[in-house]
Amino acid sequence: ISDRFHFPGFQKGKQVYEMLKASDVYIMPSVSEPFGISPLEAMQMGVPSIISKQSGCAEILNHVIKTDFWDIDAMADAIYSIITYPAMHKQLKEEGLKEVNQIVWKKAGKKVIDIYNNLLNK
């Protein structure tokens, strides 16, 4: 599979974005990831993403494909679908970019403040 997949190991700075620019699909099959930022980086670069349902970011991301980390058949199907169906690739790319551009610290902070205010008012 080495002729079709890249396993670059640790990347930093520009290397990350250069690798993402050259990618058709980003996959994060983590068993446990409190909140991986790498799918957001991929989405920011317009790369459709596949993440595990068990990752923390699965709770907030909608325009990704989510699979169980142990279900390699579902993961393979997701990869195949993104590569084979241009409309799916386009939708995940465009909607994912819109979604990730809406994630800003100000909005996240307001949500936390609203939660605390709701709890205090009960």
What spans do the regions from the language model cover?
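Nucleotide-activated donor-binding/catalytic signature segment of Leloir-type glycosyltransferases, i.e.
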Residues: I1-Q11
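Short alpha-helical donor nucleotide-sugar binding micro-motif in glycosyltransferases
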Residues: F10, E18-S23
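Aromatic "clamp/platform" in nucleotide-sugar-dependent glycosyltransferases that forms part
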Residues: V31
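Short glycine/serine-rich donor-binding loops of glycosyltransferases
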Residues: G36-P39, C57
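Short hydrophobic beta-strand element within catalytic cores of glycosyltransferases
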Residues: P48-I51
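Conserved acidic donor-binding segment of nucleotide-sugar-dependent glycosyltransferases
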Residues: V64-D73, S81-P86
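A charged, aromatic-enriched C-terminal amphipathic alpha-helix characteristic of glycosyltransferases
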Residues: A87-N121
